[in-house]
Swiss-Prot record:
GO (cellular component) term, any one: cytosol
Highest taxon of the lineage: Bacteria
Role according to the record: DNA ligase that catalyzes the formation of phosphodiester linkages between 5'-phosphoryl and 3'-hydroxyl groups in double-stranded DNA using NAD as a coenzyme and as the energy source for the reaction. It is essential for DNA replication and repair of damaged DNA.
Official protein name in the record: DNA ligase
Reaction it catalyzes: NAD(+) + (deoxyribonucleotide)n-3'-hydroxyl + 5'-phospho-(deoxyribonucleotide)m = (deoxyribonucleotide)n+m + AMP + beta-nicotinamide D-nucleotide
Amino acid sequence: MGAVSRDDYIALCTELVEHDRRYYALNQPTISDYSYDMKMRELQEIEVQHPEWKVSWSPTMYLGDRPSGQFPVVPHSSPMLSIANVYSLQELEEFFSRTEKLLGYSPGYSLELKIDGIAVAIRYEKRLFAQALSRGNGVKGEDITANVSTIRSLPMRLPQEAPEDLEVRGEVFLSYEAFEELNACQREQGKLEFANPRNAAGGTLKLLSSKEAAKRKLDLSVYGLITDQKKRSHFENLQLCSQWGFFVAGMPKQCRSRQEVVERIREIEEMRAALPMAIDGVVIKVDNIAHQDRLGLTSKHYRWAIAYKYAPERAETILEDIVVQVGKTGILTPVAELAPVFLSGSRVSRASLYNQDEIEKKDIRIGDSVYVEKGGEVIPKIVGINLAKRSLESEPWKMPSLCPVCHEPVVKEKVSVRCINPLCSGGMLEKICFFASKSALNIDHLGEKVVTKLFEVGLISSCSDIFALTEEDLKQVPGFKDRSIQNLLASIAGAKKVALDRLLTALSIPFVGSSGAIALADHFGTLDKVIEASLDELMSIEGIGPKVAASIVAFFSKHENREEIRRMQELGVQVLSKQSDKEAPLQGKVFVLTGTLQQMTRTQAEERIRSLGGKVSSSVSKSTYAVIAGSEAGGKLKKAQDLGLSIWNESKLSRILDAKSVS
């Protein structure tokens, strides 16, 4: 690691926070697990060298997934920590040496598959399934009982041989077959595909409808047992779990020596491609439970366990063509069209090439036999070329000088090539899709498939056109039925009240992501102030450097961008300003939402409450100011009634949000 400045540190924190948001909240990762782990290690090293730089929001301060805010939070019976990762046999040897030094002798180990899924804790009372929790922060997790109960391989009742009360811990996952079925369904409905089985499983566990979760064919593999009836070894515990009806994946094995562990690691790596589910490594645990107790744990990890992670899977195939796509900011991105190949449980036919420089650096040519890997991304990447198979007639590939969509000349920037034609339909379609997406305005029923159809028939050609759509317009579109029309119009109406940071994200300002948009909203408070901000004002904000500041000034200096915002406002879009504490009528008041809202989505309601200074909690307590009860409200409503709390319906919430006053 070379010389690092505090700005570099802040930039790395910001980048990892965004990766966390995309991974845990959106289930749309844009980076492989390995790349993420390497960046996290770099951040940890910087914080060791410069503890004075450490910020309270650093990703190193958190463990596990962030609460979704949709489920009650419940304490774990004992800490549910993550397992530290190693990527080489040398690092594994260091774990062995460290363990043996702490114990004073060489223990036996057990070894099991590291399924790439979501960790859960499942409690049984009187041998009946009682509750399921996510890992959360390791101390508390979200109550996901309803969704976990849909797992068909999970026993609802345990046999008499099992203890009356116990807890198992395991990994919820989707098999490759179930994952392919789910993504096929997503494609048919015009929705985003899941990046990998793990993110599909995570998204399913966060669904509010257990009926919908049941359709997705989740599975569970148990990796731990907690009971008062102490057993001698971890391996014996897994055998008991299997006898009681739990699925325990992948032939756990006891190993008496380091060499046996290494041999088993290699055996599993060879059979990895034939497994029916995704694994990203193996977990090695000290087998004797008493030895585990002696070794204990750190604030984040168990000292008695380590995860050996394999390199991403790789396949060889033919690069048949390179096509160029136009992104939402006009950047031209080359994409490899591949001869279809099976990789990590799915059929792969495309790979990301990023930019011209990347192609030149790797000397990638059409017709090459290439090696592809699939990490956390939906689209895999080319990691190498089999030069022995290259044709003597192959030629270097060059980025086109004209936009492939509008055929206007493109501009070469430092790294990127950009179409600067503001009327280019290619970039505009991408921009509108992003504007309506979950990452931006989150307009339900307006996925990529619907946007493309509306764009192709000429009903929308800009983001503001979304808010001008009428029932008569949509009736002209083939395939649109009355119910889908009403659902879409209701979602668009709900999106007209938008938090400032959400709109700034949705505008696709080059180099401004969600974290940058939040920083702008927090600093300036109103859209007008952001639009009129000077370069110096922008650069005074932490996390906004010269490049980003210049991009913001350039964006708002363009007439067409200001005109687009003005038209949105004319069509009824209200940008919710970030209010100061003195101006915030809901400041310090805690709200809980339960049931289904009709006039706005839960996300929109939460954002509007927060924009007025309020807080949104996932659980009801004496400190709750009011519970917002939609249709089909459940246990939270009953608890609020028992505590004598104020209960609002959606109409009252809307009135107060519109009036910006609780009086």
